[in-house]
Amino acid sequence: MAPHFTVIRDITPDSAIPRGAVVAMGNFDGVHLGHRAVIAAALEMGRAQGRPALALTFEPHPRRFFSPNTPQFRLTDERAKLRLLAGTGLAGAVVMTFDKARAGTTAQDFIHHDLIGRLGIGGIAVGYDFHFGKGRVGSPSLLVNEAPRLGIEVDVQPHVDIDERPVSSSAIRIALAEGQIDEATTMLGAPWFITGEVIHGEKRGRDLGYPTANIRLDANCGLKHGIYAVRVGRGSERLDGVASFGRRQTFDNGAPLLEIFLFDFKGDLYGQALDCAFIGFIREELKFDGLEALIRQMDDDSARARVLLAAAPDAFPKLGTVD
């Protein structure tokens, strides 16, 4: 049985925070390989010191606070991020609310009041480019310089490169927007996934022999419209399928929707929350002259999806349980 993952929202006098813990600090959007290097450093530091290791992260994402009217494509919402963090071996996460007060806290106050005073950290791991505090004055070098006086260990992780390019959340967003699923998967260390509740549709897919589980995604989802090979998680069960994301051009040019056809599955999924991992990009959206042409293409899409999925039989993100 996996150890319990504790989530602490903000820090109050009543918070059950294990003082002296080692923290991995960051926004962790996507929990990609660069983030995982920071987490691994915190876990190793914790083992060496005999201390638990926690994530320290912020919600909403600071970009959302500073630019509330700018569309933000997040790789992971708060719950998805926490589920990924729970799968890394960390003991828990402290989620700090990023609001006006937090944005106005100086880096020195954050270090002394929050990290040392409230959390009493024994060590901290950060990425090379992580900044914090008012005006983003707080930096890895500031933590390193303060460490001897504070009596804590600081680990600064360099960037992780793939094909001589640094891994970043921005690079992953670009890859997803271009339908480069393999590239995004490599940078993430696992397939990108979304979670959503199955809603009722117009049941046109059923009439075509392809009944779908329909999920509305965030309006700011930047995934390229098209057809994908997907693997769906329903609890511990894994179901393979093919999915269409975008506007249903053949019918009504409606709002973007994820429509998933699951192979070899019969059952009612309405109202259930599914995790959908994107394994491969098959093609862009097309508009068909008639239903026969559409069905032939759907048959071909399904065959191609089965090949992609068979080549990656274990591809799925490692997710922990979050209360």
Q: What do the PLM-derived regions correspond to, one by one?
A:
Residues M1-V22:
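Positively charged, low-complexity intrinsically disordered leader regions
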Residues P18-M25, L33-G92:
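Active-site rim/loop-helix segments in enzyme catalytic domains that contact anionic ligands
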Residues H32, L85, I124, A184, ...:
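Residue-level signal for inorganic ion chemistry
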Residues F58, F98, H159:
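Cofactor-binding loop segments of dinucleotide-utilizing enzymes, especially the Rossmann-like FAD-
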Residues R64-Y128, F132-L150:
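N-terminal Rossmann-like or analogous alpha/beta NTP/dinucleotide-binding catalytic cores
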Residues S139, V144-G246, V322-D323:
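Glycine-rich, Lys/Arg-enriched anion-binding loops that position phosphate/diphosphate groups
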Residues G201-D323:
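Phosphate/ribose-recognition catalytic cores of enzymes acting on nucleotide-derived substrates
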